[in-house]
């Protein structure tokens, strides 16, 4: 078979300096368009890619990014940054409304009649792209390939889901409020745990019954 079409195993190997990030950056820089579907996006995850995203904006390379409100994990500031790029369209699949989880991690890159796509375990977070134990597969296909047709079909289905998928301007303020409420709750829980740890645990002797004068 053609070596260019052989699947590749994409993972982080800190000892050898291998990172999932490098594979994604490489494909972004060579593509004519891209589509990304991930559950989680953080500021630290997109920061190393901002120079690349800005370069794609300058070249008018269109991109679509689909994420979710799952667990209120994605950072609104990261979403704001992506949405500010004129070449990127950002949408959010609302799992709270749909009543199901959303764990896709897929990166699709189109170059002429060829598609390269990375599918596996990596979200757009710093740890996933650089440090975590992650397993991904990179596949190369023509547009007619059965696998890419299935992937593209599922992406389009989720992207165009009218009931649960919202564009940036329609979801961001509501999501930002949900995210901030969750952050506040987590902060309160952490503070309560800290206080609980500081409280002295009474010794067993404190609970030992002492005989009164009549019992002596």
Each language-model region and where it sits:
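Pre-Walker A adenine-sensing motif
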Residues: 216
């Amino acid at each position: 078979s053609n070596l260019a079409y052989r699947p590749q195993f994409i993972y982080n190997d800190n000892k050898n300096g291998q990172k999932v990030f490098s594979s994604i950056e490489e494909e972004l820089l060579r593509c004519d368009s891209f589509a990304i579907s991930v559950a989680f996006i953080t500021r630290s995850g997109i920061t190393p890619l901002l120079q690349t995203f800005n370069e794609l904006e300058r070249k008018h390379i269109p991109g679509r990014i689909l994420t979710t409100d799952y667990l209120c994990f994605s950072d609104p500031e990261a979403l704001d940054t992506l949405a500010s790029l004129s070449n990127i369209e950002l949408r959010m699949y609302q799992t709270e409304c749909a009543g199901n989880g959303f764990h896709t991690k897929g990166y699709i890159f189109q170059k002429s009649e060829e598609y390269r796509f990375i599918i596996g375990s990596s979200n757009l977070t710093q740890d996933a792209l650089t440090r975590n134990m992650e397993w991904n597969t990179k596949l190369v296909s023509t547009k007619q390939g059965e696998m890419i047709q299935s992937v593209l079909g599922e992406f389009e289905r989720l992207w165009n889901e009218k009931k649960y998928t919202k564009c940036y301007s329609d979801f961001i303020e509501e999501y930002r409020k949900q995210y901030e409420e969750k952050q506040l709750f987590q902060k309160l829980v952490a503070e309560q745990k800290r206080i609980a740890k500081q409280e002295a645990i009474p010794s067993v002797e404190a609970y030992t019954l002492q005989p009164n004068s009549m019992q002596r």
